[in-house]
């Protein structure tokens, strides 16, 4: 995981509703600290923490539940640079290098974005097409790449 730029190791989740595979609706949430920015749950991997442990911890912290099952894992780490307007806020990092997982909410799991440190102020379960219409610009290429991969593999 060596990189020339200083990328923050990060895990991201594409969360499918519990009705998957009968209906393919994907969780997307609006960030509370930015204007109309919608994204998937994601967060940093702590030193010494496994990627999967970080996945479950971040889901619990951001959406109030870690009651998910892993459907698939994107085979590569993907990186992106922070846009200039937020790079100072994220110092010393230039961007993030991410591992993506496709997960399904377990039946009976409840989303709660009103967590101890809320990162989101709204969420929806939407179609793949709607995801592409809602996502913010600097992550769009990665979202398209990951979703297309999971589509090509027959998961969504």
From Swiss-Prot:
It comes from the Bacteria. One of its GO terms (molecular function) is pyrophosphatase activity. SUPFAM superfamilies: Nudix. Its EC number is 3.6.1.-. Coiled coil: none annotated. A motif (Nudix box) lies at residues 43-64. The keyword Ribosomal protein does not apply. Residues 6-148 form the Nudix hydrolase domain. Its cofactor is a divalent metal cation. Keywords: Hydrolase. It is an enzyme of class 3 (hydrolase). HAMAP family: Nudix_RppH (MF_00298). Belongs to the Nudix hydrolase family. RppH subfamily. NCBIfam families: PRK00714.1-3 (NF001936), PRK00714.1-5 (NF001938). Accelerates the degradation of transcripts by removing pyrophosphate from the 5'-end of triphosphorylated RNA, leading to a more labile monophosphorylated state that can stimulate subsequent ribonuclease cleavage. This is RNA pyrophosphohydrolase.
